[in-house]
């Protein structure tokens, strides 16, 4: 826990287990979109626990990190050797800033209510800007795969399938509002 970031807990009847799966979730989303750590520089906006977890996971997978201006900057972190000044190919925004760069795939950590059909909702979150629903789904899958039920990892749905199910649930729930 060199990152000092935990976002998942598990009680097994005898003790507590913890994990920080933000970084694993981001790596899974990027992999789903064809962006692998070894081939892409990750731009990070943020310096809190989620950003530290993401930087650590990206570095462990052989990636390089470019921290972009944010409220908190990294200081004395174990992955300093993975830091670069090279321009990022992909960006994750944990500070909810207006990062505008049409040349890179952007993942925002936040999401807001949407209107529309399932197809319209899917189109809204699959362009050059991915909203936080991607991270929400990827983190939950990572929790199940790594912490809650690793023995059932092969039974988990794919990231795309679970995201589609989330959009279908949101669309259905909107009909009751």
Q: Which functions belong to the PLM regions below?
A:
Residues 38-41, 87-88, 101-104, 126:
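A general structural motif
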Residues 87, 94-121:
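Rossmann-fold NAD(P) dinucleotide-binding segment
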Residues 9-12, 63, 102-104, 125-127:
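A short helix->loop->beta-strand "cap" motif at the edges of active sites that frequently abuts
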Residues 20-23, 30, 34-63, 67, ...:
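Glycine-rich adenosine-cofactor-binding loop
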């Amino acid at each position: 826990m060199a990152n000092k970031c935990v976002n998942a807990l598990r009680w097994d009847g005898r003790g507590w287990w913890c994990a920080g799966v933000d970084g694993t979730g981001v790596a899974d989303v990027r992999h789903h979109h064809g962006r692998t750590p070894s081939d892409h520089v990750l731009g990070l906006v943020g310096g809190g626990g989620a950003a530290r977890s993401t930087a650590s996971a990206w570095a462990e997978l052989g990636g390089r990190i470019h921290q972009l201006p944010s409220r908190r900057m990294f200081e004395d972190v174990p992955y300093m050797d993975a830091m670069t000044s090279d321009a990022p190919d992909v960006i994750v925004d944990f500070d909810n800033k207006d990062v505008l760069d049409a040349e890179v795939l952007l993942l925002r950590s936040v999401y807001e209510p949407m209107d529309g059909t399932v197809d319209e909702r899917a189109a809204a979150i699959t362009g050059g800007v991915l909203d936080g629903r991607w991270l929400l789904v990827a983190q939950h899958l990572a929790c199940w795969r790594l912490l809650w039920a690793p023995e059932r990892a092969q039974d988990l749905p794919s990231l795309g399938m679970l995201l589609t199910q989330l959009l279908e649930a949101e669309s259905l729930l909107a009909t009751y509002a």
